[in-house]
Regions:
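Acidic-enriched catalytic cores of C-N bond-cleaving enzymes acting on peptides and small amides
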Residues: 124-141, 148
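Conserved ATP-binding/catalytic segment of the ANL
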Residues: 5-66
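C-terminal boundary motif of the adenylate-forming
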Residues: 45, 84-110, 149-152
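Phosphate/diphosphate-binding loops
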Residues: 1-4, 76
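Adenylate-forming
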Residues: 19, 53-82, 112-132, 156-157, ...
Length: 200
C-alpha cells in the first residue's frame, strides 16, 4: 500500500515499497526529493477533506500561512476568482497577514458586454474598472468565491476580506506577468506595495 502524510508546511509526502531508491548518480536530487525515512516529497500542497479524500490545492513552494497559522494558497484562490468570465486576472495576498486581500483585473470584453447590456457608459478600461457598478459586479464574484471557500473548513480562513479592481491591466510588457500570463508576484509586490498595504 501507499502511505500519505501532510507536513506542517502543507506539502504532501508519500511512501510505498515500490518507490524508487535514488536518482542515478545524483545524490543532491535524491536528498531534495526523499527524506531519510523514505518519504517522497511531491512538491504539491494539499490536505485530507472531511471524507478522507486527498485534495491538492497548489504547489507547495507557493503556499504560505496566515497569521493564525492556517494555510494560504494564492493560486487556488486566484483560479477560483478567474473562473468568473468578468475576471481576467487576480493576485491574492495573505502570507504572514491577518486576512486575505486581492487585486483584480476585469476582463474588458466580458465587462464591456455586460456594460452595454446594462447601459453603463465608459470611454476606456480605466473608466470601466473605476465604475461603482462594475465594482459591485466584481464584488458579487468575490462573495460567491468566499461562500465556496467557507464550505471548506480547511480553507475557510482564506476568504477574501478586501479587494481592489486595478485601474490598469497587468501586462507582460510591464513585467507584471510572464509571456504565458503567469503572475510575477515579486514585481507586483514591489510595484504596488503602497496599494497592497492600503488593503490591510
Amino acid at each position: 500500500g501507499v502511505e500519505i502524510r501532510i507536513e506542517d508546511s502543507g506539502e504532501v509526502l508519500y511512501r510505498s515499497p515500490g518507490v524508487f531508491q535514488k536518482y542515478f548518480k545524483n545524490p543532491e536530487a535524491t536528498a531534495e526529493t526523499k527524506t531519510s525515512d523514505r518519504w517522497v516529497r511531491t512538491g504539491d500542497a494539499g490536505y485530507f477533506d472531511d471524507e478522507g479524500h486527498l485534495r491538492i490545492i497548489d504547489r507547495a513552494k507557493d503556499v504560505g500561512k496566515l497569521n493564525d497559522d492556517s494555510m494560504f494558497a494564492p493560486k487556488f484562490l486566484e483560479n477560483k476568482l478567474k473562473f468568473y468570465p468578468e475576471i481576467q486576472e487576480a493576485v491574492t495576498f495573505g502570507d504572514g497577514r491577518d486576512f486575505v486581500t486581492a487585486f483584480i483585473n476585469i476582463d474588458l470584453d466580458a465587462v464591456a458586454n455586460w456594460a452595454e447590456r446594462n447601459n453603463v457608459a465608459y470611454a476606456s478600461y480605466q473608466e470601466l474598472a473605476a465604475n461603482p457598478k462594475v465594482y459591485d459586479l466584481i464584488q458579487d464574484c468575490v462573495e460567491k468565491v468566499n461562500r465556496s471557500i467557507a464550505e471548506d473548513a480547511y480553507l475557510a480562513t482564506s476568504q477574501i476580506r478586501r479587494f481592489l479592481v486595478l485601474h490598469k491591466e497587468l501586462d507582460p510588457d510591464d513585467g507584471e506577468l510572464t509571456r504565458t500570463r503567469k503572475v510575477r508576484r515579486r514585481i507586483i509586490n514591489e510595484r504596488y506595495s503602497d496599494l497592497i498595504e492600503a488593503l490591510f
